[in-house]
Amino acid sequence: MLIFLDIDGVLIPDRRHETPSSLAELMKFNSDCLNHFENVLRSYPNARVVISSSWREIFPFEVIPPLFSPDIASRIIGFTPSLNPKNIHQHKYLRHQEVLEYLRQNQAENSPWVAIDDIPEHYPPDSPLVAIDDYNGFDQNSAKVLSEYLT
C-alpha cells in the first residue's frame, strides 16, 4: 500500500499563529501528529510513504526522511512528480494527477494507495483519501481512518 502524504496541515497543524523564527522551527513536525501517523504505520509494515507535499518543491528528498523516526524514515520512498507548469491549468485535481503520474512512472498503476491531505479538493470525491482538519492535523480520528484504508 502506498501512502501519499501531505505535510503542512497534516503533520504541521495550521494552529500556529506566530511566524517561525528559523528554518529548523519551520520544519518541526507536531509531535502528537507525528506520533499518531507513525504508530499507524508501525501496524502496517508493508505500507510505504510518498511525499505529495509542496515541500518536495522546496527541499531535496534527503532532507525529509530524517524528520521521521528511523523505522518510518526507511519507508519513505520518494516524491510525487511535479507536473509540467504549462499543463497545470488542465488538471482540476492537481495532487490526484501527480499521484497518478507517480504510479505510472513507477509501474504501480494497480497498486492500492491512499492520500492524506488537508485540502480534499485536490482529489476527486471518490478518491481514497484521509481528509485532515488543518487546525488539528493528523489526530486519533485520522489514525482510525488511515487504519481502515490500510486494513
Regions found by a protein language model. Give the residues of each.
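Short, active-site-adjacent cap segments at secondary-structure transitions
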Residues: L11, E57-F59, E121-Y123
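Tryptophan-centric aromatic hotspots in well-structured domains and transmembrane helices
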Residues: I12, S54-R56, Y102
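Short helix-terminating capping/connector loops at secondary-structure junctions
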Residues: S43-N46, A108-N110
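Substrate-recognition element of Asp-dependent hydrolases with the DxDx(T/V) motif
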Residues: Y44-V63
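C-terminal cap/substrate-recognition subdomain and adjoining C-terminal extension
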Residues: E62, P66-T151
